[in-house]
Regions:
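Short coil/turn segments that connect the beta-strands within blades of beta-propeller domains
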Residues: 4-5, 52-54, 96-98, 153-155, ...
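Conserved beta-strand positions in repeat-built beta-propeller and related beta-rich domains
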Residues: 9-15, 58-61, 102-105, 159-162, ...
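Short loop/turn segments immediately following beta-strands, especially the blade-tip
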Residues: 24-30, 67-74, 113-122, 171-178, ...
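Surface loop/turn motifs at the tips and blade-to-blade linkers of beta-strand repeat domains
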Residues: 37-42, 80-84, 129, 138-140, ...
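Structural signature of WD-repeat beta-propeller blades
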Residues: 45, 89, 146, 194, ...
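Asp-box/WD-like beta-propeller blade repeats and closely related beta-sheet repeat scaffolds
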Residues: 76-147
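Loop/turn-rich, solvent-exposed surfaces of beta-rich toroidal or solenoidal domains
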Residues: 246-279
């Protein structure tokens, strides 16, 4: 696939309008997606490639499904694994592709699964249900885990819970995949921390808030017992004042990390920011 780009689009299948994952060839010069095929997955709500790019993982009703990415970009199903919880909403993997982390929005659960040498999904290593109440009874008053990923040094697993306005910090044991709570970052009430990411140099930590509609930037340092974070900036996720229907969704870097992109539901916009990698 040298010099060739593919796009894999996950979709809810319960409506009957989609089968799960749609595979497209990408014509970069023309700026077009060219339909190739569909792969059946029950409600593929989130996709994540392995660190080596050889495997594609999908959320599914049964838990997680693993696909091998073939040389031509097509997908071949490897296996699936149950997570003993409701369907997840976000996936991330360890740098060496030994573990995959599943965020459970509906049941407030973080699940850790082993990954096998061939990339297939293994057994459950650990799972924790969050407890507590949030501040918005009409919407998010109970735990809703929305994003989880390892810190740059992979000593900790950080887990965003937009229902209780917290980012929990778990110590991660690479030997057996077990997690243990060591700290909690308490966010502003009714802010709903939905998504976060780290700069590749490990110096900065970015948090996107769904209801507050802002991005907060933190400095990040490796602490002996817990990570050390300090807020340095807050900026709106939209170019104008958000309306009541606006909800910040996701956030990503450009490949060179000189820009940050943020998508917003409700007003259906994408915001782009210049990024200073020194500050």
């Amino acid at each position: 696939m040298t010099g060739k780009y593919m796009a894999y689009v996950g979709s809810y299948s319960y409506t009957g309008k989609a089968k799960g994952i749609t595979v497209y060839d990408v014509d970069v010069e023309a700026g077009k997606f060219i339909y190739r095929c569909e792969v059946e997955v029950d409600n593929s709500s989130y996709l994540k490639s392995s660190q080596n790019g050889k495997i594609l993982y999908s959320i599914a009703d049964e838990g997680v499904v693993a696909f091998r990415v073939l040389p031509n970009g097509s997908l071949a199903r490897l296996n699936s694994a149950k997570i003993k919880g409701m369907p997840g909403c976000h996936l991330s993997t360890s740098k060496a592709d030994y573990y995959i982390f599943i965020s459970g929005f509906h049941d407030g659960k973080i699940t850790v699964l082993h990954l096998n040498e061939d990339g297939s999904v293994g057994d459950i290593a650990d799972g924790v249900f969050h407890k507590g109440l949030g501040s918005v009874a009409e919407r998010s008053f109970r735990p809703h885990v929305s994003c989880s990923r390892l810190t740059p040094d992979e000593r900790f697993l950080m887990v965003a819970d937009l229902g209780i306005d917290q980012i929990k910090v778990y110590r991660f044991d690479h030997k057996d995949g077990k997690i243990a709570l060591v700290d909690t970052i308490r966010c502003e009430l009714e802010s709903a921390p939905k998504y976060f990411m780290f700069s590749s140099d490990g110096r900065f930590f970015y948090v996107l808030y769904e209801m507050k509609n802002v991005i907060e930037v933190y400095s990040y340092k490796e602490g002996e017992r817990v990570p050390i974070v300090e807020k340095i900036q807050t900026i709106s996720s939209t170019g104008s004042k958000p309306n009541q229907l606006t909800a910040a969704c996701a956030m990503h870097f450009s490949p060179d990390e000189k820009h940050v992109f943020c998508s917003n539901a409700g007003d259906n916009t994408v915001s782009m920011y210049d990024r200073d990698d020194e500050t």
